[in-house]
């Protein structure tokens, strides 16, 4: 892996072509350029022209920046933009947060509940015990179920709690909550 620098506009353009959560920039570019791993680059360099040098060697990925990037990519993705209902955006955000750090997500959801309601559980029945009208839904890609009959403000506060617990920057939390 090599690291290259791109400007914000180009980064946003590439990120907007994300097909699924967790897709790497290399995968996106390969798809956009119709370049497969088996395709060999053609050597059409003019003699006397120096070959391009790599910008920098790949460095260990900073997990904090990586999770921030993943959330930004989600917000820029076509899949997220196509969601017409707040509950569907809510579910996509939860799936992404879980995929970024299972343990931190688990800790955040354990401490998240209302006066009389449990918001997250490992099964539908636990949520239904706290009210038949909770409309539990399974969070895709996770072992969790979540109640969904809350208003958008409550969904935002649930996301805010989880993201704060997972130590996301306040600006990103605000941006994510503003899109639900």
From Swiss-Prot:
Gene Ontology annotations for the cellular component aspect, listed alphabetically: cytoplasm
GO molecular function: sequence-specific DNA binding
Keywords: Cytoplasm, DNA replication inhibitor, DNA-binding
Region (Interaction with DNA): 86-87, 115-119, 149-155
Compartments (UniProt record): Cytoplasm
One GO term (biological process): negative regulation of DNA-templated DNA replication initiation
Pfam families given in the database record: SeqA, SeqA_N
InterPro entries associated with the record: Arc_rbn_hlx_hlx (IPR013321), Ribbon_hlx_hlx (IPR010985), SeqA (IPR005621), SeqA_DNA-bd_C (IPR026577), SeqA_DNA-bd_C_sf (IPR036835), SeqA_N (IPR033761)
Coarse class of the protein's main subcellular location: cytoplasm
UniProt family annotation: Belongs to the SeqA family.
Function field: Negative regulator of replication initiation, which contributes to regulation of DNA replication and ensures that replication initiation occurs exactly once per chromosome per cell cycle. Binds to pairs of hemimethylated GATC sequences in the oriC region, thus preventing assembly of replication proteins and re-initiation at newly replicated origins. Repression is relieved when the region becomes fully methylated.
NCBIfam families linked to this entry: PRK11187.1 (NF008389)
Subunit organization: Homodimer. Polymerizes to form helical filaments.
Protein name: Negative modulator of initiation of replication
Origin species: Salmonella typhimurium (strain LT2 / SGSC1412 / ATCC 700720)
Gene name of this polypeptide: seqA
